[in-house]
Amino acid sequence: SSELCKEEKIKVLAQNVNDNLKGAFTGEVSIDMLKSINVDGVILGHSERREYYNEDDDLLLRKLKVSLENNFKVYFCIGESLEDREKNNHFEKVKNQLDKTVFKIDNIDPENLVIAYEPIWAIGTGLTASPEQAQEIHKYIRNLLSERFGNKISDNTSIIYGGSVKPNS
C-alpha cells in the first residue's frame, strides 16, 4: 500500500513518533521505522495526544527536534480551548505553545514544517471556527513566525486549519 500511495502521490502521515532514534521502547515507533514504510511525515501536538497521553511541550519539543533533525516533515498542531477563546486568551495560548516548542529551534526548514491551527473547541463539538476567525489566527501565527525567524521562513511555512468544518463554512 505504501508503494501505491507513492505512485498516486498520496501523503501518508503518522499520528505519533518516539523522541528517541535508537533504543528499546516497546510499543513506540521510531522515525527510521516510519521512513522504512514510506511514511511522509508526522502529526505532533494534536490536542488528543496532549490530553489523553499527557504530551507536554517539553516532550513535543524533543519529538519536533528529532523529526526535523532527521528531515522528517512535521505537521505541528497548536490551538486553544473554548474557555481560552471565550476569555479572549487564544492569541496568548497559541503564542505560548509556539514559544515552548517551534520557537526553541534555531534552524527551521519551512519545507519540513507545517503549522496546523487546531482550535480544540471546534473538534467534534459541532462548533466551527468562522473563516474570519481562522484567517485572524493564521495571520497572527504568520506574524509570530516572521518576528522569530524572519520573512523568508515565515512566508514559506505552510499554515493550515485543523478544526471541524461544515458545508456552509
PLM regions: where:
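Active-site loop-to-helix "anion-binding N-cap" substructures in soluble metabolic enzymes
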Residues: 1-116, 120-169
